[in-house]
């Protein structure tokens, strides 16, 4: 049985921080796998592990075709061969197939060889079709790839990649993704994209990635094959990429090229290093230029690795803070083609919206005109318009325009910064209930405000803002200080359950989870049997059984589609259970 787990821990935009475990070894995603050429080690795998790289990737075809490497790998295993105790993924020779037109191994042979040498994540011999290939070639290559996928599925004994191919034809990418999602694979790389990145065709890259993502199961990590330059990490993660790999850290170093988060510079152009990594802190550009070629290459490779690691950490911190779109916006300014790709990504509104959290740890900053097209903004406008039909009184907001007055305390309207200030006004006497009802309509959908029509709202003595919401002596909900949205109490959940028809805001769990949910224990994904497809990440939800009996209320990390598909990790962080 394959030892493989992937669960989501945090998210922003369509990006996610995940926990990936293979054969008892765990890495946090997004993660990058430095490419290791076993014939030429500029930085050793052991050094990479010490630098914090918990995964590496190497080429099983090179090992297979090199007698001394093959014999040793079969004798001691790939981990001892490379002196690396982290997760080792291997390619199959597909890159050589794309570059040189052929390989001397069959699909079955390379899959079996990968198992024999003890790799953690294997790859079958797919056919990478380059961009702009004739449609007929792309279709035929994909047909062969899917045939080989079926063969690999039958014989595999390890976790395995199933690469999505289809050249630059979005419909073929989506078709391939759906077909592979039906098979028993663990990770889905998006293949044959290196030529797009090498020619700065980032806009086309966005089309390829999104076409693939819409067809893939959301519970499997997605790997952007050959992507390893830090300037694209933020954009790629915002699209939903979990894994990267690249030999660029070494290839660029050999060519005296110096990576930065905004692009690449030639060593000869630099008078100062804009970096404080161990290499840049110790040496000047002039000192590196005067070094022997081999030593200079190694030090530049180490610098490039530090920049890669630093940018991935920056992306993850942005996810934690709800600032990923802001980082994407910033990085997009580093190259006109990247900026075009950013604008192209924002056109995929439906895909982006379903993955976008309903609330964030940080305020919305209008940092550009593109920020007004971020999914959190467009969703807020659409929901506000719905609320406006019931609460027509409006106020003018410098970013969002005319908004319902009774949403003015809530995210993102109150928690936003633009060129002009927006002053949040305290509720006037007797109006606090309208704020609660309007927010319920905004947060839970049409009709939800009825659950609070007789509510008494306690105001904070310090701020004058709504806080505790009660009715007939019972606690219904809390009006959260941080984002002006509602956290449900038991009585509030019961009322919402009554006014919202099934399946609205429901997460349905099986019989095994019912007693635990009632006791206020968290709900894990494997126990979810159904969910409202309109649920979005970080929504407050109603946990029910198959008979629609209310069991608990809590906050979900997943959207409705993910709740129905994920089998690992947390589904609902239960706040309160409903005892029988």
Curated annotation (Swiss-Prot):
Cofactor notes: Binds 1 zinc ion per subunit.
InterPro entries linked to this entry: ArchSynthase1/Queuine_TRR, ArcTGT_C1_sf, PUA, PUA-like_sf, PUA_sf, TGT-like_sf, TGT_C1, TGT_C2
Active site: 91 (nucleophile)
Biological pathway: tRNA modification; archaeosine-tRNA biosynthesis
Binding site for Zn(2+): 275, 277, 280
Keywords for this protein: Glycosyltransferase, Metal-binding, Transferase, tRNA processing, Zinc
Gene3D superfamilies: ArcTGT, C1 domain (3.90.1020.10), ArcTGT, C2 domain (3.10.450.90), PUA domain (2.30.130.10), Queuine tRNA-ribosyltransferase-like (3.20.20.105)
Acetylation is among the record's keywords: no
PROSITE patterns membership: PUA
Assigned GO CC terms: cytoplasm
Similarity comment: family membership: Belongs to the archaeosine tRNA-ribosyltransferase family.
Known role: Exchanges the guanine residue with 7-cyano-7-deazaguanine (preQ0) at position 15 in the dihydrouridine loop (D-loop) of archaeal tRNAs.
Protein name: tRNA-guanine(15) transglycosylase
Gene name, Swiss-Prot/TrEMBL: tgtA
